[in-house]
Amino acid sequence: MDIKDIEFFEYVNNLKNVELLDMFSTKWFEYHKNVVLINVYLHNNNELIDVVGDDRMGHILKKFEVLLRELITTYFIRFLNFEEQIKKNNKKMLKTDELKNKNIEEENSHNHIYDYISLYHEMAILNTFELILLSDHIYEQIDSYIINLFAYIYSNLVSFLKTSSDEYFVKPITELPISEILKEENDKTHNIDRLKIYINVINTLRNIIDRIHLLNNTVVNKIVDYDILLILIPLIEKKPWKHDDYIFEQNEWIKNEDNALATVEKQLWIILYTLILNRICQEKYEMTNYRRNNILKLRKYMNEHLYEQLPPMKTLHTYIEHLYISKSVFPENKNSYLIIDVVPEIFDEIKNDILKNKKQVLSMLNNITISREVLGSISEVYLSVYEFDHQIKKSKKKTKENNSVNTNKDEKEKGGDNQYTCNNCKEMAELQCSQCKQAYYCSKECQMKDWFSHREVCSSYT
């Protein structure tokens, strides 16, 4: 999908705030198309995140607030719509008339279309943020918006924690009889799309927390004040992305043969590592008995299996053990200090606006009409994006296979000696990275030291 620079600038220029009650209008669909194509362009030209002063990045940052408002609005619409669907489903269960059932099916089909489009819209904006937040040099320009984005992230994580894998799990198609395939997919598609959003929310949080040193003090204070550890640690325990022997990986449920951690769980562990051990966070996080007991819940997960996949967790384990044997007496509740608080004004403004106009919003959602021309145009965009993604996946798979062949060839050429050098200290190595099988180390200590340099390469093999 070849999008030219001039087209990208045009798509960005076309981004404007759409009125709440104009969602799903013809004007909104044009906006939606622009968002989708901007996201595709950025991921196809992701080298721009490393270039200081790139015009393309500067252009998209000027529209950061517009995209943020749209993201938060779509989130609240999703939340409101989800509540309404639950009420409707409860009423439908009482209806048995065949004609009514037919009408219900038609209505459900209609709802599925705009539900899908709405979730796709939210995901496209979130994907865009996830990518640009990898760039260190943009944080100063978006500093005032981070607290609103964090409020969105926090609200989603709270919702995610209230769910379970039962809501999302569908057996892989290869394991289903034909009679069950359509039934299963129709039943869980909407829920799986929500799961994808929750996972992207965690990825976005990871990108922010990795750069916590770039945030101003007031924002860090607010992040600490949210006490997100009280959400993240229970999420690690609940694991909504894991169901029996399956994990949700690369947007599908797969059999977890080697009991590896799902990528989303690795992301959570690295976020926890930073929030618990980072000096900036430690200085601002007032330890209480309740908070201490929450962190100690992680103790039972500390083992060699975790260290092999995430070597830095050994350092976290040391901290947790010190916390466990500590004789320090922590207060039951945190002290109340007078601090300058930051309110997520954009988030609260949109929330209040939607609640104030709840009846009109629900009426709008119940009376959406999408013309065939608009639906056809959007479908063409989706198909192009799908084909583009499929092409990239095939290319990555081929590269991975070629790398594997080259690695095997190199190993054969080395003969019986099989001598490798440590990725960290360049001494002779005998230990192999259990995840990517590409890096070697002389000791666990060297593997831990090299992890933050190696992890990006390592993750590309998973």
Q: Where in this protein do the model-derived segments appear?
A:
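Residues that form ligand- and interface-recognition hot spots within folded domains
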Residues: 227, 236, 426-429, 437-440, ...
